[in-house]
Swiss-Prot record:
One of its GO terms (molecular function) is FMN binding. It comes from the Bacteria. This is FMN reductase (NADH) RutF. It catalyses: FMNH2 + NAD(+) = FMN + NADH + 2 H(+). InterPro entries: Flavin_Rdtase-like_dom, NADH-dep_flavin_reductase, RutF, Split_barrel_FMN-bd. It comes from Escherichia coli O6:K15:H31 (strain 536 / UPEC). It is an enzyme of class 1 (oxidoreductase). Catalyzes the reduction of FMN to FMNH2 which is used to reduce pyrimidine by RutA via the Rut pathway. PANTHER family: FLAVIN REDUCTASE, FMN REDUCTASE (NADH) RUTF. Transmembrane segments: none annotated. Gene3D superfamilies: Electron Transport, Fmn-binding Protein, Chain A. Keywords: Flavoprotein, FMN, NAD, Oxidoreductase. The gene is rutF.
Length: 164
């Protein structure tokens, strides 16, 4: 069996563009958030998406206990917020950097996100270092922001959408 090494895999994955998201939660274990591009649709019946989260991440215990999350898809111009949530910045400073509303699950929704998916974690599957969180969508909030934000070739890029 031919095993692909980690660096080759990462280099190849940099060729796959992906939306930039801030994943948030709030509940009994507290408030937390992180930046993720490993998010995708699973099915529309029932509406479900998945989020991949490293079990070694400092936020993992909070998401694991709260069992709710909000996927906030970023707009162009929110790169600094993505960097803030992708680093070691304390949670209170991350959340202080933007306007948030509370979603139906109690999770923070980013006021200026392109779209927010408010979810309950319905199933968790562990693969390697990560948990795959299957998320049943309870509410969706779209915003009239004209530009999306993607991560491609290890940098941010803006995409203009033709209509909302």
């Amino acid at each position: 069996m031919n095993i692909v090494d980690q660096q080759t895999f990462r280099d190849a994955m940099s060729c796959m563009g992906a939306a930039v998201n801030i994943i948030t939660t709030d509940g009994p274990a507290g408030r937390a958030g992180f930046t993720a591009s490993a998010v995708c649709s699973v099915t529309d019946t029932p509406p479900t998406l998945l989020v991949c989260l490293n079990r070694g991440a400092s936020v993992w215990p909070v998401f694991n206990e709260n069992r709710t999350l909000c996927v906030n898809t970023l707009s162009a111009g929110q790169e600094s917020l993505s960097n803030l949530f992708g680093g070691k910045t304390p949670m209170e400073h991350r959340f202080a950097a933007a306007r948030w509303q509370t979603g139906v699950t109690g999770c923070p929704q980013l006021g200026e996100a392109l779209v927010s998916f408010d979810c309950r974690i319905s199933q968790v599957v562990s693969v390697g270092t990560h948990d795959i969180l299957f998320c049943a969508i309870e509410a969706i909030h779209r915003h009239a922001t004209p530009y999306g934000l993607v991560w491609f070739d290890r940098s941010y890029h803006a995409l203009m959408r033709p209509a909302c």
